Each structure stands twice: as structure tokens, then as C-alpha cells.
């Protein structure tokens, strides 16, 4: 179908910023057509624009994809995590952003986070969120699971 490159790269808040921001190439957002359904892709911080992870402003990429005709966004996550309080705050921030952005863009969001290390809670929930912002399929917050959900076009 195509290729998506990370759009909102992470980097330190120092001047100059360090991290992905200095190593990753970015490409314009694209929508792929799959028999009458517009599909988009986002990688990790592309979706939630965590202010602690990037010096760039929030470009609202889910809204941009909706404007380009996307109806479903596939979201791949490899978030940082730990057992501390701020990991819990990050989880809540990620979940709220997933739900709010699905609802605002009237989009389906299919999201999957890396589950390792499995002795800690994931950095964000995995599953499927409807255009109403509701979870219609969701995995446990910790450990490895597989999910399947049919989205009617």
C-alpha cells in the first residue's frame, strides 16, 4: 500500500535539540485508498504530540489526515515506560489524546503499543477506538495480547 515516515520527531528541549529530530527523515502526510476507505498512518508521538518529548508545536496530524480523507488511522507506538508515577500520567495523557482525537476527527483509530518489558504497564492502551471516541476493542494494559476487530466501511 505505501510507506509512512514519522512526522513529529522526538527530541530534547535543549538548543539545539538532540534525538530523533536530528536523525530521522520526515515525509508529507499521505492517505492511502483501500477499496473506498481512506487510510492514514501515524507513529507514536505523531498522534499525541507529548510536550515533554518534542520541541515542535502540535500540528494536529489526526485532523490533517481527516481533512485529506482518512477514515481509519493505524497508529504504531513504542512508548517509554517505567513503574513510576509519571508513567501513569503518561498513560492517561496518551489514552485521553487517542479518544479525543478520534472523536474530533470522526475517525477510527487502531493503535498498538510495544508491550516490553512485560512487567510494566504499557505506555498507552492498544485496541480500536470508534469515531465517537469510545473503545470498541481494547487489550489489557500490561502484557502481550492479540486483537481483531471488524470495521464496517
Regions found by a protein language model. Give the residues of each.
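Conserved hydrophobic/aromatic beta-strand scaffold that supports enzyme active sites
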Residues: 3, 29-31, 128, 135, ...
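A broad, structure-centric signal for solvent-exposed, well-ordered loop/edge residues
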Residues: 11, 16, 135-136, 146
Amino acid at each position: 500500500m505505501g510507506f509512512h515516515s514519522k512526522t513529529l520527531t522526538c527530541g530534547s528541549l535543549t538548543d539545539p535539540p538532540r534525538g530523533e529530530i536530528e536523525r530521522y527523515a520526515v515525509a508529507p502526510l499521505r492517505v492511502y485508498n483501500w477499496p473506498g476507505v481512506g487510510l492514514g498512518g501515524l507513529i507514536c508521538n505523531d498522534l499525541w504530540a507529548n510536550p515533554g518529548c518534542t520541541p515542535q508545536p502540535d500540528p494536529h496530524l489526526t485532523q490533517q489526515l481527516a481533512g485529506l480523507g482518512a477514515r481509519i488511522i493505524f497508529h504504531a507506538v513504542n512508548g517509554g515506560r517505567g513503574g513510576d508515577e509519571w508513567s501513569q500520567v503518561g498513560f492517561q495523557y496518551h489514552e485521553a489524546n487517542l479518544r479525543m482525537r478520534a472523536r474530533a476527527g470522526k475517525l477510527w483509530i487502531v493503535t498498538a503499543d510495544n508491550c516490553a518489558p512485560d512487567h510494566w504497564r504499557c505506555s498507552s492502551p492498544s485496541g480500536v477506538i470508534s469515531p465517537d471516541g469510545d473503545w470498541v476493542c481494547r487489550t489489557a494494559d500490561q502484557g502481550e495480547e492479540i486483537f481483531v476487530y471488524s470495521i464496517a466501511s
